[in-house]
Structure formats: structure tokens, C-alpha cells
Amino acid sequence: MTQKTILNDTHRALGAKMVDFGGWDMPIHYGSQLDEHHQVRRDAGMFDVSHMTVVDLHGARVRAFLRDLLANSVDKLKVCGKALYTCMLNPQGGVIDDLIVYYMSEDFFRLVVNAATREKDLQWIGEQAVRFDVRVEERSDFAMIAVQGPNARANVIDLLDPADTAAASKLGRFAALQTRSRDGIELFLARTGYTGEDGFEIVLPQEAAVAFWNALLAQGVKPAGLGARDTLRLEAGMHLYGQDMDDAVTPYEAALAWTIALDEGRDFIGRRVLESQKAQGAPCQLIGVVMDDKGVLRHGQAVFTASGEGEILSGTFSPTLGKAIAFARVPAGSIDQLRVDIRGKQVPLRAVKFPFVRDGQAQPGVLGD
């Protein structure tokens, strides 16, 4: 049965085109995916991301539990509200999910995990938590709204209780605080996102979500759908679980080495496989590619290199760049001469560093300059 967020009727009233996304009835756009993309890059847009799963972890040994569970090290989290992006691995080093973990207190951490992986994540986390006597609490009572873009933070801060605006204005990146709106709505305000733009991801009680969404609308923040969210995140060089990595792919094979902390004295699930792969080298690599010819890069297209064949993972037409961009997984080795098979024709590709776009501008080399 398709699930609906608390904002479903609101999306329909705004004229959204709804699609099935991982078992959820979600807005793909509200008229123009292109306009919504540019709105976020140039001003501010908001997304209903209530399909994401919030998981609260409680217990005296919750930090020790997360040191074991996650490939990145929660020992980096020492200030209340600080956050960390990390992968959660299986014993073979494959990525069960990528997630954000927030440090709330020594006996309370919060995770935000992907919607499509909810059931397997909760099962895995629950199984591992038993050894540490950690209580796992799924917060299905929450909704989540992401407000993203150069003017996103200012628009949200205008809606906060005046007593909280100074703290919200000073909030650093990858940090969160508990605050409230002018109307007294309790808000978990995180300076994070999935677009490459500044902004907030806001966790709030479901029963308050429609009112807060409408308050943002009244501020002039326009809604954006999952279509724009996908083109924005790929331009920003951000991964999509299930497309760019999965439980058969290690972080080293997904260009996520920066999320691995091989700190001394910490044995986390999957560590031994990662240590071996780091020493020997991964057999494949995730790279960013640009196609200068006309056309669109799509998931599953074959990519040819001097070292063998790979494939396109996430691919799209970049509204900011006016070119097709993609992630590709190809064999380890040279990536100087790349071609993609598009309907039987081999078309040249250029390998580039990602993100493709930062602060609304093409990164050096992406446009071929």
C-alpha cells in the first residue's frame, strides 16, 4: 500500500504531479522541474522529505554502539547538535545505507536514514543494538521539511521565536539545535541538505507540518519536487542510495573514502574488508563524467574505458550547466578515454572532479574550459 506524508493533500492543492517513490506518494514537480531547480539555486525552495526516517537511539552505551555500527567515527561529535555523514556497512564492507547522525547528549543520538531502506535499516540497527543495551525508537510522529537555497536560512529564521533567532543565525554547517517557531511549534533545525545549497532541514511534529509549510509559502518560499531535488543533488556531487551504491559496493568503490575513519582502537563492522581494500586498491572506481554532445546520460548505459567496461549510475541533464552529467562506476585504471553507449552509438565523455556545481557556479574544468 502506497504511503502518504501529512502534506499529501497540500501538494495536490498546489497542483503537484504525484508519483510513487519507494512506496511513497510524492510530488515530482509542481508544474516545472526546471523552474524549481533554478529557484533553489538562485533564491529558495522547499521540499517535503517526510518520507525520510528519523531514528532516536537511547542508552548509556549509545556512543560505543555507534563506534561499532558506523564507518565514520562519532568520536568527532563532541558538541551537542553536531552532525556527521557516514555509511553503515555490512560485514563484507558493503553499504547498507548512508545516513546522518546527530549528537544530542551522551545517552541520546539521532539518525536520519533513507526512506527506501527503512525496513532493513531498522532491522539491522535493532539487531546490533541488543549487544549494547541501546533502545531504538523510530520517530514516525515527525515530518520533515527541507528549505534550501541562498535565501533559505533567512526565510526560516524569520519564522522563529525571536528568542531563538540569534542562535539559529549562528548555527554552523552540519549542526542542529532545538528551537521553536513564532507560533510555538517545536522544531529540530539542522543546517544540512541534499542540494549543494545552504539551508535547513527541519524536523517537526506531523500535526504542525501543514501550518509551518503554509507559513513558508506566505514567506514566498516556493515548493519544489523530487525531480528538482535529484538534479540539484547530482550537480552537487551527492550520492543516491540504491543507484550510486548499495550493499554490494564498498565506500572505496563509491568515492566515499572521505567518510571512512580507520582510527586506532576502533573495530567497526566491515572494517577488515576496508583495510584490505585500501591496501590492495579497489577493483573499480566512481567518477564524475560530462557529455559535451547533445543527449542525456541515464542509469545503466554502458561506459567503455581502456581498462574495461563500466556503467552510468546517476545521470541527468544539468539545468545549471546545460550539459548531461553523471556518476559512472568503471574499472580501476586510466579514465582518459571514455565513451558511453547511447542507442548503439559510442559518444565521448570527459571525466571531471565533482561536485559539478558549487555555489551555483560550474566547477573548474566541468565546462571544458
From Swiss-Prot:
What is this enzyme's catalytic activity, as reactions? Answer: N(6)-[(R)-S(8)-aminomethyldihydrolipoyl]-L-lysyl-[protein] + (6S)-5,6,7,8-tetrahydrofolate = N(6)-[(R)-dihydrolipoyl]-L-lysyl-[protein] + (6R)-5,10-methylene-5,6,7,8-tetrahydrofolate + NH4(+)
Q: Which UniProt keywords apply?
A: Aminotransferase, Transferase
Answer whether the UniProt record assigns the keyword Nucleotidyltransferase to this protein.
no
Q: Name one GO molecular function term.
A: aminomethyltransferase activity
What GO biological process term is on the record, naming one?
glycine decarboxylation via glycine cleavage system
Family annotation (Gene3D superfamilies): Aminomethyltransferase beta-barrel domains, Aminomethyltransferase fragment, Probable tRNA modification gtpase trme, domain 1
Name the Enzyme Commission number(s) assigned to this protein. 2.1.2.10
InterPro entries associated with the record: GCS_T, GCS_T_bac, GCST_C, GCV_T_N, GcvT/YgfZ/DmdA, GcvT/YgfZ_C, TrmE/GcvT_dom1
Record bears the keyword Transferase? yes
Task: State any GO CC term.
Answer: glycine cleavage complex
What role does this protein play?
The glycine cleavage system catalyzes the degradation of glycine.
User: Which family would the database say this protein is a member of?
Assistant: Belongs to the GcvT family.
Q: How does it assemble?
A: The glycine cleavage system is composed of four proteins: P, T, L and H.
HAMAP family according to UniProt: GcvT
User: What is this protein's record name?
Assistant: Aminomethyltransferase
Q: Which organism is it from?
A: Xanthomonas oryzae pv. oryzae (strain PXO99A)
Q: What is the lineage of its organism?
A: Bacteria, Pseudomonadati, Pseudomonadota, Gammaproteobacteria, Lysobacterales
